[in-house]
Each structure stands twice: as C-alpha cells, then as structure tokens.
Amino acid sequence: MYHLWIKCLAAWIFLKRCNGVHAMPAKAPMYPNEPFIVLWNAPTTQCPLRYKVDLDLKTFHIVANANDSLSGSVVAIFYPNHLGVYPHIDERGHFFHGIIPQNESLTKHLNKSKSDINRMIPLKTFHGLGVIDWENWRPQWDRNWGSKNVYRNRSIQFAKKLHPELSEDKIKRLAKKEYEKAAKSFMRDTLLLAEEMRPNGYWGYYLYPDCQNYDYKTKGDQYTGKCPDIEMSRNDQLLWLWRDSTALFPNVYLEIILRSSDNALKFVHHRLKESMRIASMAREDYALPVFVYARPFYAYTFEPLTQEDLVTTVGETAAMGAAGIVFWGSMQYASTVDSCQKVKTYMNGPLGRYIVNVTTAAKICSHALCRKNGRCVRKHSDSNAFLHLFPESFRIMVHANATEKKAIVKGKLELKDLIYLRKNFMCQCYQGWKGLYCEEYSIKDIRKI
C-alpha cells in the first residue's frame, strides 16, 4: 500500500511537470541573484601553489574552494575513508569495518563521523555543498549486482552464522531484511548528523538518484536514454533518503563513446529528468536543489568536451532547472605544469566562455521573467530550448589588468529575446513567492522558510 501511494505521488508530479506547471517552489539559490551556478570540485591546488598556473576559475564565474582545493567551504566531499567507519570492500579487495553495515557499530560510526565533520568543516555556519561519496554498496539489496554482489553474499554468510538452524530460503530473506535495515540506518543517520551539525549546508549522497541508463554501449541507434521503469520504481522506494536530503547530486559524466552524439543528449536529458522528478517529490514545502556532477573532460580521458557536449551537459542542466553544475576532476588535472596549462587553456577558451554565457543567460531570464524571485525552467522538458545569451544582443569580453582578469557581458535584452524566453520558459518561484512571474508574496511559503 505504501509503495502504491509513492507511485501515485510520483505520477501526479510527473503530469504536473509535463503540463508546464511547477507544483512546488524552489529553495532560494545558494548565492543571492545566482539562479544557476558552476562549482569546481577538482584537486587542482598544485596548479596555483606549486606550478604558479592560475586556472582563472573566478574570471569565468566559477565558484571554488580556497586554493582550488578538493574540499573546503564551498564544496566538502567525503570519501569512504573521510567519514566515520564506513563498512566496505575497496577496489583492491581490502576489507574495512566489518565489510557489511549490519556487522559494524552504528554508534561507533556516528561518533567518528562527528569528529570527521568537525575536522573537515570547522565552520559551523558552513553554507556549501556537503557531498557524501559512498559508492561501494547500495542500500537496496536488488541494486547490488555485478561486483557489488559480494555484499549480498557476505550478508547471507553473516545471517547463516547467527542462525544456522534456518533454511536457505529463510536465511536469504533474513539477510536481505537485515542488510537493508542496517544500510538505511547508516545512510540516514549519517545524513541527519551532518545536517544537525552544519544545518546551513546542502547535504546529500553523490550519484543519488541514479537512472541506470548506461545501455548506450549496446543499444547504439536504438538507445533512448530513458531510465528503466524498474529503476524509477526503486528510486521511489528511496523516499526515506530523499526526505532527509537537502540536495541531490546526480552525475552526467560523458564517456568518449558518446562524444558529440545524439545519444549523449539522451543520456544526460533523462538522468536530469529523473533527478528533477525526485527533487519534486522529496518534500512538501519545496523542491530539493539539484547540483549535477559533470566532468570538463571525457570520463577516463584528458580530452576536453566538444562545444556540442558543453551544451549537452552545462546547457541542458541549466535549462532543466537545476541549481547548479559541479565540475569534478582527477589528480591528473594538476599532475604537471603542462596538465595545469591544458586546463587553463580550455578554461580561457570554450569552457570558460560557455559557462559565462549560460550563468549570465540564466540570471537575465530570472530578472526578465521572474523578477529575480525564481529561476527559468523549460516549459516543456523535452524541448530543445536553452538558456543562452542572444548573439545579436550580447557579447562576452575578457578584460585584464595588473591585478585581475574578468569576463564581462555587454548588451541588453531586446523585445524579440523576451518573447522567445516567455514562449519557451516558465518561472519556478523561490520559497516566499508565487504567481506566473513570481510577482506575489506567498505568506504560506514564507512561514515555512
């Protein structure tokens, strides 16, 4: 009965969005008057400090931690060995903390997590992204396939050791029940602890929600990009996680096989669509902010995204109504002076200019359509409308002097531009505002803030 209610709720929200109506307001943006932001979450500290290569992130409207570090006051990412005593098996087969969640003390984990959060985020007024990156196992038994099947096997062994008198069938059912209960407790209680300690942060788990639409390698031209129904249903069953999250962190990493292809857009679009669906069903008062993880280079390579794929990732993310995009990267970006220079060159070329284009266009649309009280979202999520600067009305220039370099946008919105925006986009009002153009105070929403 509970699962049926969730499905009905999800279907109602989906119909609302398809009809171009936002049933819920959005949380106010992370920074005032910045409806769509781009953040940097790559370990590039060595570029400015060791190699004296400034990546010019600030120049192109990218928000980053101090010294371009991986974790800080803007984005704090917690890997398995950074937060508590996370039970798991690593990629090399090493065992940690009882391997499975039901074989480790939750109290011990939370006590250690508390000290880890204080160490990594000393500022109690932390207002950044708190991203917990636990990818070794999934909280749902049926999603632990492939290499993650080891957690099911270990759980069965654990249950059999405690209850040798039970039949194989009962052992498997008990193992599943105990595993899911413990996994839920680990994930939920960790999240609630983090939110209690740093209540102004945006907390959630990396790669949640997922869509499992990775079959582009086998489907070829038959690939639709759609999330399998079973995976959407499983996401519905994680309502407990969405309710306790204060942000969502899906990813849209592109492999090189998708370069400049129709399949790339299908892959990204449906992952975003599922994330926005989950964001709208998580709470009663506002849709969760979605910060989408992307890579400026193709996954597992050091080859920059094409202009077309920048539109596919950054452009699609903004047009679908996400709060921002987070660029993640590997140590390779800062491994040598040449690597740093390659990132800088890309930043000063297509990447930086496109980021300025989209972030500025999102701001202009928010001003023109939503009176700065909401963000622009496609009226029809499957359309090909993007939040881009109108080339006949605006131009991007980079000004540099002895002390700073800054990208500046010059121009003004023309009537024909406004007509285009009104035709293709609608306002998702921030909490406290309502109306077609977010022009009215909403006393009901203000009381909830």
From Swiss-Prot:
This is Hyaluronidase-2. It holds the Pfam family Glyco_hydro_56. GO terms for biological process: carbohydrate metabolic process; hyaluronan catabolic process. Snake venom endo-hyaluronidase that degrades hyaluronan to smaller oligosaccharide fragments. In venom, it is not toxic by itself, but increases the diffusion of other venom proteins by degrading the extracellular matrix. In addition, it displays antiedematogenic activity. The keyword Hydrolase applies. The keyword RNA-binding does not apply. Residues 1-23 form the signal peptide. It catalyses: Random hydrolysis of (1->4)-linkages between N-acetyl-beta-D-glucosamine and D-glucuronate residues in hyaluronate. It comes from Bitis arietans. Glycans are attached at residues 67, 103, 111, 153, 357, 401.
